[in-house]
Amino acid sequence: MKTKLYLPIISLLAMSVFAFISCDDSDSDTTKPVIELSEPEEGQELKIGDEHGVHFEMDLSDDVMIKSYMIEIHSNFDHHSHGKSRAAATGEATVDFSFNRSYDISGKKTAHIHHHDIIIPANATPGDYHLMVYCTDAAGNETYIARNIVLSTTAEGDDHHHAE
């Protein structure tokens, strides 16, 4: 009778010890993913109103597994002097451009990303912007890369177009 009582207790104790050993942090993923952004380049001028979109290309990698990446573009006008903007000088109505989109790429250790999803509308305010790319792995480690870009009506359009 006592054997029947001790067996469940010993089994529960053994499972608890196994669970604590399995939770050892020495095997957890603490390495951030790597971003190698090819396009757009630092300081690159991007054409406002180009219906083909911005040529965006990068390679992502992680030692275990990538989960997602996010692209963010926002204005960087605050570092300028307080002169008149092009919109104020010409009387044209423009809007500060922003872009924020996440992409799920779960299940891969490496990914080559190439697309033209970023469309800069014709009424975007020309000037300096920040392009931020964030990458998160399956363990929640995040890394980012930042680029300074310029939106311009006089920039040359991108000749690098592919059918998706």
Positions of predicted regions on the chain:
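Extracellular acidic, Ser/Thr/Pro-rich low-complexity tracts
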Residues: 53-65, 75, 137
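Conserved structural position at the C-terminal beta-strand
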Residues: 133-135
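Short, solvent-exposed loop/linker segments at the N-terminal edge
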Residues: 44-52
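Aromatic sugar-binding surface patches on proteins
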Residues: 95-117
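Extracellular and select intracellular beta-sandwich modules with Ser/Thr-enriched
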Residues: 31, 142-147
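Extracellular Ig-like/FN3 beta-sandwich strand-entry sites
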Residues: 51-53, 66, 126-130
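Bacterial Sec-dependent N-terminal signal peptides
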Residues: 2-5, 15-45, 156-164
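Surface-exposed, short loops/turns at beta-strand junctions within beta-sandwich domains
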Residues: 110, 122-127
